[in-house]
């Protein structure tokens, strides 16, 4: 059986990237973290003091800089023009600004075109906010992950602790709620479950349990990949 495309969508900190990395490794597929692309543009904008509300300068960043990936043992390394930014794009200032950048229609056009180029050959696990609806609408398997705000804030809190980033739990909850609102209400490619996506609530589930649930969906659709 040929390689398929797997789209995993969901709100911030719902577990998308973690399970997508594991699935890609299990299947020997390419893993594409589309959120990292928007984070990279956001990072460039902040570094160059570009107004994140101004669309044209952001589009220029997309056109004039090259975002690339390298597969790594624990997922994926991210580069801008050959310089690694894997950790830099996960800092709080980028996290809090990325929704404002990704709402711009022309920025999304540039990013979606690049993402579709990566995914056109199949054999890819791609995660983001609009993969099943806009980027890979014909993906054979579409998953929509959700989790409670409290659980997602707890995950982000632990991630920040491990990175030595001091954050307040209630502040994280407020930030996640704000991102949910921005992502789901933007005019271009809002966060929405594709009509043919399978919804999985990851609240209270381990990573292994979520991966197993997705494996079951794949098998139920007739793809014996494992």
Swiss-Prot record:
So which domain of life are we looking at? Bacteria
Q: What is the annotated localization of this protein?
A: Cytoplasm
Q: Which residues bind ATP?
A: 10-18
Q: What class of enzyme is it?
A: transferase
Reactions that this protein is recorded to catalyse: CMP + ATP = CDP + ADP; dCMP + ATP = dCDP + ADP
Signal peptide span: none
GO-annotated molecular function: ATP binding; CMP kinase activity; dCMP kinase activity
EC assignment: the record states 2.7.4.25
Where does it mainly reside? cytoplasm
The cross-references to InterPro entries, in alphabetical order and at most eight, read:
Cytidylate_kin, Cytidylate_kinase_dom, P-loop_NTPase
One Gene Ontology cellular component annotation held by this UniProt entry: cytosol
SUPFAM superfamilies of this UniProt entry? P-loop containing nucleoside triphosphate hydrolases
One Pfam family this chain carries? Cytidylate_kin
Q: Name one GO biological process term.
A: nucleobase-containing small molecule interconversion
Alphabetically ordered keywords of this record:
ATP-binding, Cytoplasm, Kinase, Nucleotide-binding, Transferase
Tell me which family the UniProt entry assigns to this protein: Belongs to the cytidylate kinase family. Type 1 subfamily.
Read off the PANTHER family from this record: CYTIDYLATE KINASE, CYTIDYLATE KINASE/PANTOATE-BETA-ALANINE LIGASE
> Which HAMAP family does this entry report, sorted A to Z?
Cytidyl_kinase_type1 (MF_00238)
Q: What is this protein called?
A: Cytidylate kinase
Q: Which species is this record about?
A: Enterococcus faecalis (strain ATCC 700802 / V583)
Q: What does the record give as the organism's lineage? A: Bacteria, Bacillati, Bacillota, Bacilli, Lactobacillales
């Amino acid at each position: 059986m040929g390689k398929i495309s797997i789209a995993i969508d969901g709100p911030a900190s719902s577990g998308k990237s973690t399970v997508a990395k594991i699935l890609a490794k299990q299947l020997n597929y390419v893993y594409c973290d589309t959120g990292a692309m928007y984070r990279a543009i956001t990072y460039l904008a902040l570094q160059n003091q570009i107004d994140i509300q101004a669309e044209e300068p952001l589009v220029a960043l997309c056109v004039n800089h090259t975002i690339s990936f390298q597969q790594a043992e624990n997922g994926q390394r991210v580069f801008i023009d050959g310089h690694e930014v894997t950790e830099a794009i996960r800092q709080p200032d980028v996290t809090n600004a990325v929704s404002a950048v990704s709402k711009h229609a022309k920025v999304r056009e540039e990013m979606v075109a690049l993402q579709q180029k990566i995914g056109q050959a199949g054999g890819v696990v791609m995660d983001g906010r609009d993969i099943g609806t806009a980027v890979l609408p014909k993906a054979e398997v579409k998953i929509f992950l959700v989790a409670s705000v409290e659980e997602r804030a707890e995950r982000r809190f632990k991630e920040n602790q491990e990175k030595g980033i001091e954050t307040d739990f209630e502040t994280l909850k407020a930030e996640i709620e704000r991102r949910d609102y921005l992502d789901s209400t933007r005019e271009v490619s809002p966060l929405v479950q594709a009509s043919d996506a399978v919804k999985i609530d990851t609240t209270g589930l381990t990573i292994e349990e979520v991966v197993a649930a997705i494996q079951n969906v794949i098998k139920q659709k007739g793809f014996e990949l494992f």
